[in-house]
Amino acid sequence: MSPHNTCTLQITRALLSRLHILFHSALVASVFYYRFSNFSSGPAWALMTFAELTLAFIWALTQAFRWRPVVRAVFGPEEIDPAQLPGLDVFICTADPRKEPVMEVMNSVVSALALDYPAEKLAVYLSDDGGSPLTREVIREAAVFGKYWVGFCGKYNVKTRCPEAYFSSFCDGERVDHNQDYLNDELSVKSKFEAFKKYVQKASEDATKCIVVNDRPSCVEIIHDSKQNGEGEVKMPLLVYVAREKRPGFNHHAKAGAINTLLRVSGLLSNSPFFLVLDCDMYCNDPTSARQAMCFHLDPKLAPSLAFVQYPQIFYNTSKNDIYDGQARAAFKTKYQGMDGLRGPVMSGTGYFLKRKALYGKPHDQDELLREQPTKAFGSSKIFIASLGENTCVALKGLSKDELLQETQKLAACTYESNTLWGSEVGYSYDCLLESTYCGYLLHCKGWISVYLYPKKPCFLGCATVDMNDAMLQIMKWTSGLIGVGISKFSPFTYAMSRISIMQSLCYAYFAFSGLFAVFFLIYGVVLPYSLLQGVPLFPKAGDPWLLAFAGVFISSLLQHLYEVLSSGETVKAWWNEQRIWIIKSITACLFGLLDAMLNKIGVLKASFRLTNKAVDKQKLDKYEKGRFDFQGAQMFMVPLMILVVFNLVSFFGGLRRTVIHKNYEDMFAQLFLSLFILALSYPIMEEIVRKARKGRS
């Protein structure tokens, strides 16, 4: 059966968005007409005008996402003839077993091994950038358990193929109405899984194993060779452990360098035309995800220029009261659909199926570098260069397994990329620490397209951050990296405009400059309460027709956001939480990310990779599920937040007192209202501040 996919334009949503753009633009124009007509009203007025110009600039960029939203669907992926399916490699990257629990990593590995895909066409690679003895030891045991698990899943067509998730209470509904053979086999595989977990737990307690080794030679080990699957045995995919060489003082280019190493190593061992990239804490939740992606990659209309299929990041541990917006609803349920209606979504850090050759050339000439300067582009390995050609099987024929492994050690060496185009024109770029986002941007600029699929059943599930510090560190990292791109020679306003559509350029410009929200909120957060405290009016008085323009912009923005939240299946409470966390992120993570990018630009700081802690603390999780903010470890971010919250609280009551005394209610009405609105949003933060203060005194 031929793969089938559909792309449906969301006509109602697009029409409403375009009408809103016209209406809101008229209101914004009215506001600025009023501001500039009264521009001589003092420095506070000028600062407020500048802040509003910044906000209007970002708002204008955002409208590109709303111009042509589409929804895609696939049909009959499970009916695709296995002979039609191309080879697929799965790349899973881990870096530190202390921050990325090794049991979570192994669940991701085992779930990938159990994908509904021909075993002889599937290969799973684990990149251990920490070179940890623990990870290498445990993956061998994972392969032993994996053979039982893959066999069990295939025999009974198990839908949830992450063992940890399958044996949890979430999957009780899947384990009913089965015969005795199933129950016996399930009991057997469960006992093996429990034994595996105990083994991992005991090994993790050994301090000599749970370490990161930053001075080491390269190591490539075939944990399980799919070619050795015997007749009548469970067919399990190729499983490979890779720890590239690392030496002190050498720039290893973080995750981008790790994936480029995997590209070379896998090029000799499996050389699949497509690969899936997964975060180490994100497991395969739907075994048909690869087949669904192939419904696009095998489509003759899309295939020649299609670089990647992107799935949303969905998390199993986000609560209904998602105070940190861990699910990133605005991105995955609004913005990505909007970009998909242009030439495709931005590449996320995980859950995407990418065409290997897209990283080596352009859609119209994928082999240009291979043909014109193979050694300069791809390095000195003749065997690897041979693997890039059309006759790969012929090129590698006659090489023994030991010879291939010896060559992979060379490909994983830290000096292999010296004087080559790796990291610039070949593979993932090293110009930005946000390797996937930047890679997707460059692919679009080369002429490639992408598609976005948001199926009803999540194809991949991960673990979201559940405390303030980790959530803000993540946003700070993204802001710094994206601002860095925005002010570089690859800025969407210069580099992209001549290579992709204006609308898509504006989408990327939004990602690059959304950190400027910090400027708007910092000015508003200081000037507005200060002027209220001093009795200086910054808005038209109550009853003045010009106030309707300001009120219109405010209400129009809130209603647009509310519509998007409700239409994506969320609640009013989710809308309120998003309003709050938007402000918090802007005056904390975006502010520090902006400063970090500026310091990197002038050379005061050097950009460094910050690994997010993925180990979940039960106490923090309990706070998160109760809707309480956790400020532990987030002192750096809390300083500007607490100062502005307390300042706004003091200025509101001080300004209200002054207004009552002077009876200038009409002049100060708008400022009092905005201050009260911010206080309402800030209430949970003030509550946590008071709670911590009481706890500190007791």
UniProtKB/Swiss-Prot annotation:
GO molecular function per UniProt: cellulose synthase (UDP-forming) activity; glycosyltransferase activity
Gene that this sequence comes from: CSL1
Cell compartments where the protein resides: Golgi apparatus membrane
Positions that bind UDP-alpha-D-glucose: K99, E100
Origin species: Saponaria officinalis (Common soapwort)
Topology in the lipid bilayer: Multi-pass membrane protein
Family stated for the protein in its record: Belongs to the glycosyltransferase 2 family. Plant cellulose synthase-like G subfamily.
SUPFAM superfamilies (alphabetical): Nucleotide-diphospho-sugar transferases
InterPro entries: Cellulose_synth, Nucleotide-diphossugar_trans
Name of protein: Quillaic acid 3-O-glycosyltransferase CSL1
Highest taxon in the source lineage: Eukaryota
Catalytic residue list: D129, S436
EC number: 2.4.1.-
